[in-house]
Amino acid sequence: MRELTYVARRTAEWREAPDPVLQSDSDAIVAPVAAAPCDVDSAILAGHGPIPPPFAIGHECVARVVDAGESSRFSPGNLVVVPWAISCGTCDRCAGGLTTHCTSVPHMAMFGAPIGGSWGGLFSDLVRIPWADAMLVPLPGGLDPMAMASASDNWPLAWRLVAPHLRARPGARVLVIARGSIGLYVCDIARALGASDVLYVDPDPAHRAIAEGYGARTAAEIEPVHHGFDLAVESTGRVPELVTALRSLAPEGFCESAGNHFRPGELPLLEMYLTGVTLRVARDNVRAHLPQALELAASGQVDPGRVVSGVFDWEQLPEVLPERHLKPVFVRADQPVGR
C-alpha cells in the first residue's frame, strides 16, 4: 500500500509501506474514503511543526472497515469515524474521558505524526486501528462523509470548545479569533446552540463570508473589547491574538485556546487575575465526546459542509495538500463514499 509522507516544507509524496495486518482480535483495518487536513497539518506542511520529516501525515477521515478481528463489533463495509488519538478505552484515563492520555500507549500516541510511536497516517490507502471497538465511531446515517471528513478532530474539537459552555451559560456572547476551519465550525455550532452574539475575527474575507453565512458578525481585526464576551475561542496559534481574546472576556469568562502555539509568548496574567478568567490550552479528548458531536451534526441544525473548500481525488494528495486551502477533502475512487 501507499502512505502520504511529509518529506520537506510544502512537499509530500506517496511512499510504499507494507499492508497493515490484524495484530489482535480487537483490531480493524480501514480504508479512508474521505479525508481532510487538520488545521495543524497546514502548519506542519508550512514547516512550523516541532517534528522533522519524514513521516506519514494525516489524522482526519471517515473510513470504511475492510477487515476486523473476531471480537470486534465492526464488519467489512461499515462507515466509521477514526479519532486522531490512539486509546484503549479501558485504562483509568480512558474511563475518565481522557482518551488523549491513554496509559496503554506512549504519551500522545496518534495518527499523522510520530509522537508516542509510529501509527501511520490517515492519508494512507489502509490503516490498522487497535482497540477498534473503543476507538471507532459509526458514522450516523444521513451524514455525508465528505462534509464530515473532519470528524476525527477539528469538528468535534469545535463542539467541545463551545457546546459545554453554552449549556452552562445559555445565550452566552462568543468571540472567535481564528485562521482556519476550527473557528468556522465554532461559529456554526454556537449559532445552533443559542449564543446571543458571535463575533468572528479573521483577516481572510472568504473565511469571514462563511462565518456570516452562519449568522456571525465579522471583523478583519479588533482591539480588545473590555468585558465584551463570556466565551472566547482562539485558534490562530498566535500569542497576540490569544492576548486579545483574554482581554475581551467578561468577569469569570472562559477562553479556549485551540491554536498550536509553537512559539512562546507573554500573557496578561495580572489582568486575567483581576478579571477572574479561566484559560484552557489543551488537545482534545475527541473520542469521549465524538458521539455527542455527531448527534448534533445528524440533527440538521448545523452545516459543516460549508467549510469544505474543495473536493479532490485521492491521487491529487501530493500536489494539492501542500497548497493553501481552508479545508480540502480528498476522496477515493476505489472506495465510494456512499453506503
Feature map (PLM): residue ranges:
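Glycine-rich phosphate-binding loop and adjacent beta-alpha segment
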Residues: 195, 239-299, 332-339
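Glycine-rich beta-strand-centered segment in the early N-terminal region that forms part
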Residues: 20-35, 48-95, 120, 140
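NAD(P)H dinucleotide-binding glycine-rich loop of Rossmann-like/cofactor-binding domains
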Residues: 90-177
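Mid-domain Rossmann-like dinucleotide-binding core that forms the NAD(H)/NADP(H) cofactor-binding site
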Residues: 79, 138-221
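Short N-terminal strand-loop motif that marks the start
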Residues: 1-62, 124-127, 131, 333-339
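Short, well-ordered loop/turn sites that connect or cap secondary structure elements
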Residues: 74-75, 168, 249
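A short acidic, Gly/Pro-enriched loop at the edge of an enzyme's catalytic core
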Residues: 224-232
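C-terminal hydrophobic helical "lid"/dimerization subdomain
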Residues: 1-3, 287-339
